[in-house]
C-alpha cells in the first residue's frame, strides 16, 4: 500500500516600497504652453540646480546660498510652507523618499551626502563623497546613488554600508564603460541604472551588475 504524504509549502513575501515618490503621468499627458512663475528671482538669489516634486505635488528646493530646504504644499507658490535648516553648503541635488526623508548633496565643501529624518527632524551624514553629487537616487532596497559630475562616475552606497562604483571608470571618456560629466540618474525596479551622460550627449543604461552601458 502506498501512502501519499502531502507537501507543505511556505511562501515568504517581501513587500518593497517604491522610493521614487514622484508623480505618475499618462502616456498622452500634455502641458500648457503658457507657463507661470512658481518661484521668482528675488527668492532664488542664485541659479537653482535641482528641484523635487513628490507624488502629492509637494515641491522641495535646496537653496544654494542659505543651505536651507524649502517645501511648498498644495501649489502654494507664494510662500514656502516649511523651511528645513541644516549645515548644507551649496547643495547640488535632492531626493525625497515616500516616507518624507530627504537626501541632500553636501559634497562641494563638506564631502558628504546628508539625510534629514522626518520622524525626529534630525540630520545625519549617510555617505562620504569626493565631489558634489549632481544627481541622487534611492532604489527600492534603500541603496543610495550619487552621480559625480567632476569624477565621471556613479557611486552606490549599499544599505550594508559598502560603497562601490557602478558606472563609469573615474576617467572622462565616451566608451561604453565610461562617462563624461554624468548628471541626472534613475534606478528602476529591476535595479537598472539610467545616467544622463551630459558630456557625451547621450543617456546610458547600465543593467544590474553590468559596467558596460
What are these regions (language model features)?
Residues 20-47, 76-92, 103, 120-132, ...:
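Gly/Pro-rich loop segments of beta-rich domains
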Residues 53-56, 96-99, 138-141, 187-190:
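Residue-level detector of Asp-centered blade-edge/turn motifs that repeat once per structural unit
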Residues 5-19:
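Cleavable N-terminal signal peptides of Sec/SRP-targeted secreted and luminal proteins
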Residues 67-70, 110-114, 152-155, 163, ...:
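Structural signal for beta-propeller blades
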Residues 61-83:
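Beta-propeller domains
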Residues 56, 64-65, 107-108, 149, ...:
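Short loop/turn segments immediately following the C-termini of beta-strands
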Residues 18-20, 39-67:
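Beta-strand-rich domains and repeat architectures in extracellular enzymes and scaffolds
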Residues 58-60, 101-104, 143-146, 192-195:
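Conserved beta-propeller blade signature
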